[in-house]
Amino acid sequence: MFEGLSPLARDARSWPFEQARATIARVLRVRLPDRADQDAAKALIDAGKTDEAVKAYPALAKAVIFETGYGPSGLPHLGTFGEVARTTMVRQAFRALTDEAIPTRLIAFSDDMDGLRKVPDNIENKQPLIEDLGKPLTVVRDPFGTHDSFGAHNNARLRAFLDGFGFEYEFVSSTDCYKGGLFDATLLTALERFDAIQKVMLPTLGEERRATYSPFLPISPSTGKVLQVPTLERNVEKGTIVFEDEDGSKVEVPVTGGHVKMQWKPDWAMRWTALGVDYEMSGKDLIDSVKASGAICKALGGVPPEGFNYELFLDENNQKISKSKGNGLSMEDWLRYGAPESLSYYMFQSPKSAKKLYFDVIPKASDEYLQQLDGFGRQEPAKQLDNPVWHIHGGKPPQQGSPVSFSLMLNLVSAADASTKEILWGFLSRYIPGASPETQPLLDRLAGYAINYYEDFVKPSKVFRAPSDQERAAMLDLLAKLKAMPAGTQDAELIQNEVFEVGKTHGFDPLRAWFQALYEVLLGQSQGPRFGSFAAIFGIDRTVALIEEKLG
């Protein structure tokens, strides 16, 4: 899909391409120790000859690993999804820059062997979780009764959503890696280099924590809980540690085979090393953790991955979105009110800027996505690679957009008091020749989202007001001009110009006060899209009737 794009991708400046270039540099640095080989391979890649670079340097034929991490302690939220979406965009840019001559994998890693530390606020059936506190998430009982464990339930929620978006990824479970032996060799290295890990971690801890900290968290053979206890003895030759169990007895367990897990910063480093991760991004709140894990990764003989720290998502009160609190939008929420493409667009925009993630952002994200999609076909090929829709759709955005914006659709729903898509299509089919749900599938989906959004957010907050004397006079004047137009007029620009002139004639300054008055008096809202577009699609006769009704 991405073959032959490297000449165009070479000059692309959107952030996924910048991250992909940094990843290429890391791959060359790690796999080709000789600087001359690095330079020669880079020259071939820059010249669009990555296939020749791979033939000349077989180390480049190994798959490049892109990873995203997920802690399934609560229900997945859109911030979790955003990391997968953004990492996918970097992976696609990498594939374009290398003409797919270097294989890639995207791992969605679930830290599901972590112990359940607290019961999420937004779960009704809390008792099983209360009783299983401290146990690995894949042992904690599922309060929903649908899966073998709470971790399995939340993993399934994440996978179902990612599958719904069509992401290409490999799901990897921490529990499977620990118990299946994939981490064993690196865990034995960690045991051998215990002191080097402690040298990184202890300065980051308080005095009391330093006294008992161990990078290894044994699983109690008696209670099944993940224990935060000191390591009393280490036996590198046997590959074991000794600790004091909850009943006071001393227990010796191997660090392999799922008998222990690592504290999360050493665990992150161990995972990077064991899996050979080349790229992983993370939130701004983890900057210090990335530094610590990077140092531990080096101590284990690995090389920290490339990546960057993105800004956090905030709820409407500027609080960080939390899986356990369940604040902010859920994945299901967004998909009730907006197209998946609009969500991906939102994730693409300025990842290093803090963003509010709540219901009000959906209409704006939807309309901006539609604008970018509409402009894509008119752009030069080189410019298309920096258009968000190229990244959203894996380089193949749909050729058909939507002739009606989401904001305009919302106003149509409001004016028509439409409760079904069939009612909306009565207006849309007259305004757009040949349009139907079959010929305009995106428009049909937007109609459904707009109805849901209107019913849940717009309708309950509508506040109509009577016009002032100035506004009444202007609306009567507009009424006369609309009545004078030929029946069936659908020229949005013509109507908009008439509305504009009426506002100027009646002395509205600034003119936006005139348009605001129209929406407040006619629709009970403080803002909306261009009034001319609304009147054209709603119909001149219906717009006249609406004005007459509100003027009494």
Curated annotation (Swiss-Prot):
A single BP term in Gene Ontology: lysyl-tRNA aminoacylation
Protein name in the entry: Lysine--tRNA ligase
A Pfam entry, by short name: tRNA-synt_1f
Organism: Caulobacter vibrioides (strain NA1000 / CB15N)
Family affiliation: Belongs to the class-I aminoacyl-tRNA synthetase family.
Cellular-component GO terms for this entry: cytoplasm
Short sequence motif 'HIGH' region: positions: 72-80
Molecular function in Gene Ontology: ATP binding; lysine-tRNA ligase activity; tRNA binding
Chain positions recorded as ATP binding sites: 323
Subcellular location: Cytoplasm
UniProt keyword terms in alphabetical order: Aminoacyl-tRNA synthetase, ATP-binding, Cytoplasm, Ligase, Nucleotide-binding, Protein biosynthesis
Superkingdom: Bacteria
Catalytic reaction list: tRNA(Lys) + L-lysine + ATP = L-lysyl-tRNA(Lys) + AMP + diphosphate
'KMSKS' region (motif): residue ranges: 320-324
